[in-house]
Curated annotation (Swiss-Prot):
GO cellular component terms attached to this protein's record: cytoplasm; nucleus
Site (Not modified): K69
Annotated protein name in UniProt: Antizyme inhibitor 1
Alphabetized InterPro entries for the sequence: Ala_racemase/Decarboxylase_C (IPR009006), Azin1 (IPR031178), De-COase2_C (IPR022643), De-COase2_CS (IPR022657), De-COase2_N (IPR022644), Orn/DAP/Arg_de-COase (IPR000183), Orn_de-COase (IPR002433), PLP-binding_barrel (IPR029066)
Organism: Pongo abelii (Sumatran orangutan)
């Protein structure tokens, strides 16, 4: 099955039964070693299709609006658009990206908490009416620049207020909601619903209980003031595991039945991001420099070998000014795998991993145990599909890694069963035979 050909900026390889993603990574490591290329990603688009099927099976009553800033790679957006998800956009560029795919404006939400006036005007121009708001100043800005705006009032959760610094800045209190609703009435701004967000790091199911209870209170307040609200956005916070999704559904499903029952006219939506893409992308990085240091130079409390053994600092060709940008604000939740084969009884050494910038902030892994590696060896990082695809920094002449998209035949058939056809995908699929050894000339990739 050689698929179809269109003038596109990327290709997607179809893997036969004898080829897996490990084989693909091996081939590209070989190619990049020969040509001295940069780090690269391999994206398994079939995993995105599987995540959507999982979502439909577990929480079919909640419509997903994919958070574009999480990963705006064109192949990702095209697959999700073909699957029928909505999109949560934070900027004009993101809105334009998804509208170019034919996504109707009603399937787009403008979720930036701090909106530029020019971008509010752009949303008005292209018909993106649904947006979020959590304060009076933002509400007035919307009123002046978007006459058809339909606003979701963003309320804080106990999770936000309780100490997660990245989220506590956004979302209004329940106490302040009546004031904002009255302001909206005076400004003639239509409030159509409520949004809240619970972090994926939150382990307390009671946070959802309180958030949904608060949302119901806001709906009741709005009714008293004269608004008819019809949308509830339960935010993101989905890690990507079926277990976590089922756990969340176990908590919220009975509450939704009580507070927003079927037939109430309230549409339930969510903003999954990393849920869809995290596990779909693997990053391969090359070691470009190495230092031998004393073991006691590593901070106490980290995983170390004996003090009389050497420790190593390895510098890679990607770091926080590239694909590991999220490391600046959160801990890395993936452990590197050594690509080369080594013996089971080979000694392990205390090691730290760094990006290429020589900046003290550019530390990727503080401490881990690895066999001794050499310059030119490769490390593989799984679960790198979320927050890794930002514009490359000019720091240290960083270049964006290539992305090689793949999918198994079984996933391709599953995609067709889901209603995605070649015409709707507009992709250039090609067949990847088993055990193929790729060279520079017969490479079938395209840079993102």
């Amino acid at each position: 099955m050689k698929g179809f050909i269109d003038d596109v900026d990327y290709s997607v390889g179809l893997l036969d039964e004898g080829t897996n993603l490990g084989n693909v990574i091996d081939n590209y490591v070989y190619e990049h070693t020969l040509t001295g290329k940069n780090a690269f990603f391999v994206g398994d688009l079939g995993k995105i299709v599987k995540k959507h099927s999982q979502w439909q099976n577990v929480v079919a009553q909640i419509k997903p609006f994919y958070t574009v800033k999480c990963n705006s790679a064109p192949a990702v957006l095209e697959i999700l658009a073909a699957l029928g998800t909505g999109f949560a956009c934070s900027s004009k560029n993101e809105m334009a990206l998804v509208q170019e795919l034919g996504v109707p404006p009603e399937n787009i939400i403008y979720i930036s908490p701090c909106k530029q006036v020019s971008q509010i005007k752009y949303a008005a121009k292209v018909g993106v009416n649904i947006m979020t708001c959590d304060n009076e100043i933002e509400l007035k800005k919307i009123a002046r620049n978007h006459p058809n705006a339909k606003v979701l009032l963003h309320i804080a959760t106990e999770d936000n207020i309780g100490g997660e610094e990245g989220n506590m800045k956004f979302g209004t209190t329940l106490k302040n909601c009546r004031h904002l609703l009255e302001c909206a009435k005076e400004l003639d701004v239509q409030i159509i619903g409520v949004k809240f967000h619970v972090s994926s790091a939150c382990k307390e199911s009671q946070v959802y209980v309180h958030a949904l209870s608060d949302a119901r209170c806001v709906f009741d307040m709005a009714g008293e003031i004269g608004f008819t609200m019809n949308m509830l956005d339960i935010g993101g916070g989905f890690t990507g595991t079926e277990f976590q999704l089922e756990e969340v559904n176990h908590v919220i499903s009975p509450l939704l039945d009580v507070y927003f029952p079927e037939g109430s006219g309230v549409k339930i939506i969510s903003e999954p991001g990393s849920y869809y893409v995290s596990s779909a992308f693997t990053l391969a990085v090359n070691i470009i420099a190495k230092k031998v240091v004393e073991n006691d130079k590593f901070p106490s409390g980290v995983e170390k070998t004996g003090s009389d053994e050497p420790a190593f600092m390895y510098y890679m060709n990607d770091g926080v000014y590239g694909s590991f940008a999220s490391k600046l604000s959160e801990d890395l939740n993936t452990i590197p795998e050594v690509h080369k084969k080594y013996k089971e009884d080979e000694p392990l050494f205390t090691s730290s991993l760094w990006g290429p910038s020589c900046d003290e902030l550019d530390q990727i892994v503080e401490s881990c145990l690895l066999p001794e590696l050499n310059v030119g060896d490769w490390l593989i990082f799984d679960n790198m599909g979320a927050d890794s695809f930002h514009e490359p920094s000019a720091f240290n002449d960083f270049q964006r890694p290539a992305i090689y998209y793949m999918m198994s035949f079984s996933d391709w058939y599953e995609m067709q069963d889901a209603g995605i056809t070649s015409d709707s995908m507009m992709k250039n699929f090609f067949f990847v035979p088993s055990c193929i050894q790729l060279s520079q000339e017969d490479s079938f990739s395209a840079e993102a």
